[in-house]
Amino acid sequence: MNIDLHAHTNQSDGLLAPQQLIDLAMENGVDMLSITDHDTISAYALINKLPRSLKLIPGIEISCSWNNRTIHVLGLDIDISNQIFIKTIKDVVDQRLKRGEKISKALEKLGIKNSLDGALKYADQNLGRPHFAQYLVELSLIHI
């Protein structure tokens, strides 16, 4: 049995849309998959077609503070309809946006304009550092 319990989509810092990830998992013989995007469960609402042969385990990777450090905790087999959980995730996403505003101000001091808007083009709802990196690639300021 092939299992992947830690996969990201473009709803956080992955490159593939949720349905593309599921299709790729099927092409590669994955039997059980958990989409564990950073601080969001939005990928699950974007899945159009789930093959019967693929068991999808609802998951998330949540950013937490512990001993003055940020750590990531995987949650598996979560209830994606729990309203308290959804509210908590929204609060974390709001914090990520505030962090993004700080990153944007720092980039502005370096002469890079409109970085918040640029990063948000790649972020959908859940802004993170990789989205700023994608914008810097777009501007040809960094190369991968």
Q: Which stretches of residues belong to each language-model region?
A:
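An N-terminally biased module of ancient metal coordination in phosphate/nucleic-acid-related enzymes
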Residues: M1-R69
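Histidine/acidic residue-rich metal-binding segments in metalloenzymes
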Residues: L46, K102-K109, Q134-L139
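Short, amphipathic alpha-helical segments
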Residues: D79, K90-E101, A123-N126
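Glycine-rich, often acidic, oxyanion-interacting loops/wings at catalytic, nucleic-acid
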Residues: K121, L127-Y135
